[in-house]
């Protein structure tokens, strides 16, 4: 069975800059509303169907959570749905913030 891959926040940012990669944030709505990575799509149970309809299976998908734990399960789920290049962002949003990468705040 295919597996997701791990990627650090710098690698994730580089992939976003040089490809058609999509960044999805699976944190709770309140956390996402307060602050999230620039260009992040809030992936929830309610938005998963529209996301899967809008994204090509060949597009790289980066999955972000709080610390890089929950994103692994979500990344594997996306692999199981047929997405070919899925990455779990190690360290999650916390690492993204620590690395001072682009963030949108409410």
From Swiss-Prot:
This is Thiosulfate sulfurtransferase GlpE. Residues 17-105 form the Rhodanese domain. One of its GO terms (biological process) is glycerol metabolic process. The gene is glpE. SUPFAM superfamilies: Rhodanese/Cell cycle control phosphatase. Its EC number is 2.8.1.1. It is an enzyme of class 2 (transferase). The active site is at residue 65. Keywords: Cytoplasm, Transferase. Signal peptide: none annotated. InterPro entries: GlpE_sulfurtransferase, Rhodanese-like_dom, Rhodanese-like_dom_sf, Thiosulf_sulfurTrfase. One of its GO terms (molecular function) is thiosulfate-cyanide sulfurtransferase activity. Belongs to the GlpE family. Its main location: cytoplasm. One of its GO terms (cellular component) is cytoplasm.
């Amino acid at each position: 069975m295919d597996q997701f891959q791990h990627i650090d926040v710098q690698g994730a940012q580089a992939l976003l800059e040089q490809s058609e990669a999509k960044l999805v944030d699976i944190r709770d709505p309140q956390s996402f509303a307060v602050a999230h990575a620039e260009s992040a799509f809030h992936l929830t149970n309610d938005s998963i169907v529209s996301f899967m309809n809008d994204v090509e299976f060949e597009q790289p998908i980066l999955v972000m959570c709080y610390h890089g734990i929950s994103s692994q399960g979500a990344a594997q789920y996306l692999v199981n749905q047929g997405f070919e290049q899925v990455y779990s962002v190690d360290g999650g949003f916390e690492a993204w913030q620590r690395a001072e990468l682009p963030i949108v705040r409410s």
